[in-house]
A protein has these predicted regions:
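N-terminal accessory segment detector
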Residues: 1-102, 108-124, 134-135, 139-178
Length: 178
């Protein structure tokens, strides 16, 4: 603490851009970066995927309990995926949906600028979306066609709801019920 005779500001009054959200996003960014540097992108994505699956299970259970249902319909899955991202400051929206796929766009990553250069962090979206879709609809394959992490201005995420020629040709991860 500065005394009255000095002009040095008090530490607690310094304009340091640090609060819990920034700290946690930075922590996740650095953990993902360290994993990418130490074990490589593919392995880092695998580690983040495990976390994403657990988080997806928890979020899925919370929405089903709040809605009072045992299983979400296809339209409810789309609504839940958009809503969960909204709640964590993402800006996902449905571009289109049919019996084979739900296609999402996104204008803002919940990790903000901390995701840039850390594509392994996108496995959170892949796994949370994949787990929720598969647990409720039986199957999902998530293809991250464009991501902010890799420099795109927004994300394009396709959640395939059944195996098709198109889904089998698309890069991505498959998820199954159970």
């Amino acid at each position: 603490m500065a005394d009255a005779s000095t002009s040095q500001p008090r530490v607690e009054d310094l304009p340091i851009p640090l609060e819990r959200d920034v700290f946690l996003r930075t922590l996740i960014r650095e953990l993902a970066g360290t994993l990418q540097d130490v074990v490589g992108l593919e392995e880092a994505s695998g580690f983040v995927s495990v976390v994403g699956q657990r988080v997806g299970d928890q979020i899925n259970a919370a929405y089903k309990a709040a809605l009072g249902v045992e299983s979400l319909s296809k339209s409810e899955v789309a609504d839940v995926l958009v809503d969960l991202k909204r709640r964590i400051q993402g800006d996902f929206y449905v571009l289109s949906q049919d019996d084979e796929a739900i296609i999402f766009g996104n204008r803002a990553c919940p990790f903000g600028e901390k995701v840039i250069g850390r594509p392994s962090m996108c496995m959170m979206t892949s796994n949370v979306f994949g787990v929720i879709a598969a647990e409720n609809l039986g199957y999902a394959k998530v293809s991250l066609e464009a991501t902010i992490a890799e420099g795109a201005p927004g994300c394009r995420v396709v959640v395939y709801l059944k195996p098709t020629t198109e889904s089998e040709a698309a890069p991505g991860r498959e998820y199954f019920q159970g």
